[in-house]
Structures are given as structure tokens and as C-alpha cells.
Design a protein with these regions (language model features):
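ADP-ribose/adenylate-binding Rossmann-like module
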Residues: 73-77, 85-109
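Short basic, glycine-rich beta-strand/loop surfaces that mediate nucleic-acid
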Residues: 72-79, 109-129
Length: 136
């Protein structure tokens, strides 16, 4: 996927993660570092996510269209390919940026490798190839 490099301000913006496991945890941590208002919806939410988010920002159960519509971006990080695909379709039809952890072809954005030195941030995308280049 050829991606346009862009940095966006997500401070205090609602970012939805659907899924409550280790992959979701990594995305929670990343978004929180940039000041996002992270919400998690999942059938089960790991303890580490529960420690990082107040109860008002996490819910056990199934994601709803309203959850998606109120978000500025969505990450589909469930263990169900079908669920992730359904989330992607809902986001696509509403022009909401979506990252699907198990289907790059359904993503409208990716998480680049990030190098941060003070106020300088560099995002690196290798298109899934030459991952050793990230360590420059």
C-alpha cells in the first residue's frame, strides 16, 4: 500500500480500539502517548488495559455502529477475522480511518515505526518489506 505520510493531532480525540488483548494493549499505549481519548470495546479486556483506562472508557461486549460513528479513528484488533472485516466495512462506509491488524489491504492508515528525539518525530514505513531499515 502506498501511504501518504501525515501526522495528525489526536489529543483528546476519541480513538476506538475493538479488541482487548496484547495487540490492543500496544495500540492503547501508543495512542495514550499522544494524548488520545482511547476507548476499548471487547468481549474480554486484559488486566493491563483495565489498569490504563478508566471504566468509562472501556466496555465488555460487542462494538456498535454508534461506537464507531463517534470515533475519529478505529483499530480493529480482535481475534475474529469476520469481526475485523465488519468493522472495516462500517468505517469505510463512514469515511472513518481504520487500521485492521490482520488485513493490511483493509487499512486506511498504518502505524509507522516512530523515532522520537525531543520535539522531532520521524515516521518510517517500509511497506512491510526490509524491516531492518527501521533501525537506521
Amino acid at each position: 500500500m502506498a501511504c501518504f505520510p501525515i501526522f495528525i493531532d489526536i489529543k483528546q480525540k476519541k480513538c476506538l480500539i475493538v479488541g482487548g488483548g496484547k495487540v490492543a494493549l500496544r495500540k492503547v499505549e501508543t495512542l495514550l502517548r499522544y494524548g488520545a481519548c482511547v476507548h476499548v470495546v471487547a468481549e474480554q479486556i486484559c488486566e493491563d488495559i483495565c489498569k490504563q483506562l478508566p471504566s468509562a472508557q472501556r466496555r465488555t461486549g460487542h462494538v456498535t455502529e454508534t461506537d464507531i460513528e463517534k470515533s475519529v479513528l478505529v483499530i480493529a484488533a480482535t481475534s475474529s477475522r469476520e469481526t475485523n472485516h465488519r468493522i472495516a466495512e462500517l468505517c469505510h462506509s463512514r469515511n472513518i480511518p481504520v487500521n485492521v491488524i490482520d488485513a493490511p489491504e483493509e487499512c486506511t492508515f498504518i502505524f509507522p515505526a516512530v523515532v522520537q528525539k525531543g520535539d522531532v518525530s520521524i515516521g518510517i514505513n517500509t511497506g512491510g518489506k526490509s524491516l531492518s531499515l527501521i533501525h537506521i
